[in-house]
Structures are given as C-alpha cells and as structure tokens.
Amino acid sequence: MDNEFTRSMWNYPFKLTYRLILREKELHFNIGVYNPSKDHTFSFNLLLHTYFKVPDVRRCQITGLHGCTFIDKTRDNQIFQEGRDVVTVCEWTDRIYQNTQPEHIITNVVSGRKMRVQKYNFPDTVVWNPWQEKARDIPDFGDDEFPNMICVESGHVSSPVILLPGTAFEASQILQV
C-alpha cells in the first residue's frame, strides 16, 4: 500500500498486489507491482523467501541449475558456472543463480517427497543454507536447525525490475508436492 509510512522508506507511488491460492497439493504465489506515476520511473528487486523443511539438507537435490552462472556470496561475490546436473548443499551456501530454468525439482523434502517449483518472470534462483557457523548468528534461527531446512527462492535479484510510468510487473511461483 502506498501511504505515508511506505513513502518514508521508498518515496515512489506504487500499487502492490500479492495473492496466494492454496489447493490440495499446490500453493500459488502471484505478485504484481504497478507504477501509477505519470513522470517517474522506479526500479526494485524481488525475492520470495521460500524455506523448505527437509529431513536432511545433505540429502536434498535441486534440478534446473545446470549450466547457469551464479554469484557465490560466500566467496566474495565471485561468479562461477554450475557444472552439476543436480545441486546439493553440504556447507554454508548463499548463491544467486542467474537465468535459471522455469522449473526446479527439490528431492527429499518433507517425508522424502519431491517439491516442484514452477516460476514465471523470476529469472533468478537463490539457494541458501546458513550451515552451523552462520546459524549461530541468526537470532530467530536455532543453532541446530540448519540440517532441516533449505531455501530455494525465486526472484529478480541480479538485475533490477525497471518500471516506467504507467507500467506493471507481474511474476508468479507454484509449489507442488
């Protein structure tokens, strides 16, 4: 909502809609941002912080990232190319994968199931786990919780969305078990 409070943090008129649809085995996320200004362009980044509960993060596999370049935030933002067919996490991980596939499969999610992540207009995918050393630094994160979670986050983070006056941006994500 565009109001005095939001203007104190970000001085642009805007309209944001966020719609969630829950179905039996699916969760849909739809987000829209509209720039009602007649004169001003603005830019922003967007990331859906999706935390998945897993039995053991070391046994999870993520598809749809092979061949993508990624920014490794654990290694001074160096850029690498992903050579693995499936990505696994066995250490502190904070990566921004760029120009990723519109679908990822995450294996060994809750009860050993697969989670399908389908995304539209989110070119980036962040894979994150704080591991033991970083989990201690997060106040609302238990020191022993890192093995039971993984973040696979759809976003528009490596380059901003630029909204010209009177234009809109829409993106969506569907999670399926």
Residue positions per predicted region:
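Active-site/ligand-binding surface loops and adjacent short beta/alpha elements
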Residues: 39-44, 51-126
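Surface-exposed, gly/pro-biased binding rims or lids
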Residues: 65-84, 131-132, 139-161
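Exposed beta-sheet edge/beta-hairpin loop segments within beta-rich domains
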Residues: 9-12, 21, 158-168
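Short Pro-Gly-centered flexible turn/kink motifs
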Residues: 31, 162-177
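Short, well-ordered beta-strand segments enriched in hydrophobic/aromatic residues
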Residues: 20, 27-35, 166
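Hydrophobic residues positioned within well-ordered beta-strands of beta-sheet architectures
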Residues: 16-18, 29, 46-48, 150, ...
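Glycine-rich active-site loops that engage anionic ligands at enzyme catalytic sites
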Residues: 108-150
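Extended, loop-rich substrate-binding clefts of extracytoplasmic carbohydrate-active enzymes
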Residues: 1-24
